[in-house]
Amino acid sequence: MDIEKVNSMDFGEFVDVFGNVIERCPLIAAAVWSKRPFSGLGDLEKHFFAFIDGLPLSGQEGVLRCHPELAGRQLPWGRLTAESQREQSAAGLQNLGAAERLRFTELTAQYRTRFGFPFVLALRLSDPAAAPRELARRLRCPPAQELRTALGEVKKICHLRLANLLGEQP
Amino acid sequence: MDIEKVNSMDFGEFVDVFGNVIERCPLIAAAVWSKRPFSGLGDLEKHFFAFIDGLPLSGQEGVLRCHPELAGRQLPWGRLTAESQREQSAAGLQNLGAAERLRFTELTAQYRTRFGFPFVLALRLSDPAAAPRELARRLRCPPAQELRTALGEVKKICHLRLANLLGEQP
C-alpha cells in the first residue's frame, strides 16, 4: 500500500486499516486522519507519536492499559488482537516452560501493581530469552522513567505495524 | 453494581466493564481508572466527560469517528458493538422503509462529507421518527457548533450506558 492510497482513504477505511497500530486504540488512528495528507511512513507515524505525547498523564497510562499482558492468563489467546497474537507467537513466549512461565507471570503481576499498567515490550525487536530479564530490570525503574520507557515500546510497536501495513522495511 | 465494587476493580476489569461507554474508545475508560476512587455515577461520568473535553480537536473528532453510522451500510450489523446494536434496535431504525432508509443513508453520507465524522445521536432519548428530521437539521449547522452538539450526544450515550451498568435510573 503506498501513501497515495493512504491519503485517499475516508475515515472509515483509515480506522479499519490503522485502528490497531496503537493496540486497541482506534481513537488515535481516527484522530490522526485529521492530519492527512501524509508525505510517507515517517510523517504518518509522527502524528501517531505526537498524539500520544500530547495526552495527559492519565491518557498515556490509558494507552498502556489497552495492551495485553505478555504471556498472561488474564487475556486468553483467543481475545488477543491479531497483531498481538502474531507478535507474541513470533517471540516464542508461548513456548516458555512451566517454571519460567510462572516466574514471568509473577513478575508481570508485580509490575502491574507497581506501575498501574501492564508490561509492554516490542517483542519483534527483542531476543525472546531477553524478555524476562528486561522485565526484571524495568520493574526496578522509577515510575516516571518507566512510563517513558513503556511509551517508547508502544511507539516501536506502532512503527513496526505501520511499516508492515505500508510494505516498507522497518 | 455499586460504586464500591467499581472502586475495587483493577484496570483490566474496569476496562472490560466500562471500555465501551464511549463507543470503541477503551483508551478513555483506561485513562479514567487513574482518577479512582469515584464517589458515584455523577463523579465517574464527570471524569469521562473531562477527558473528552481535554482532547485536542483531532481527538474529539476521533471519538466521533469511532461511532458507527446509524442504519448504515458501512458497518454491517454483525460488526456493531453490543451496546450500539441494542440501542439501534430499540430505536427501530432497522424498521425504516426502503425509501426512508435510502433518504436517511443519503443524508448521513452528506453529513459525513461535510463534517468528517458520522452522525451521532443518543437514540434512546429520541423519538425514532425524529432521527431523520434531526439529521436534516444538524446537517445545516456550522461545523464548530455541530462538533459540540455531536460530543453532547456522545456524553448522553455515555451517561445512559454508565447508568445501565450501575443499575441506576438515568
UniProtKB/Swiss-Prot annotation, chains A, B:
The keyword NADP does not apply. It comes from Bos taurus (Bovine). This is 2-oxo-4-hydroxy-4-carboxy-5-ureidoimidazoline decarboxylase. InterPro entries: OHCU_decarboxylase (IPR018020), OHCU_decarboxylase-1 (IPR017580), OHCU_decarboxylase_sf (IPR036778). The gene is URAD. It catalyses: 5-hydroxy-2-oxo-4-ureido-2,5-dihydro-1H-imidazole-5-carboxylate + H(+) = (S)-allantoin + CO2. Catalyzes the stereoselective decarboxylation of 2-oxo-4-hydroxy-4-carboxy-5-ureidoimidazoline (OHCU) to (S)-allantoin. One of its GO terms (molecular function) is 2-oxo-4-hydroxy-4-carboxy-5-ureidoimidazoline decarboxylase activity. It is an enzyme of class 4 (lyase).
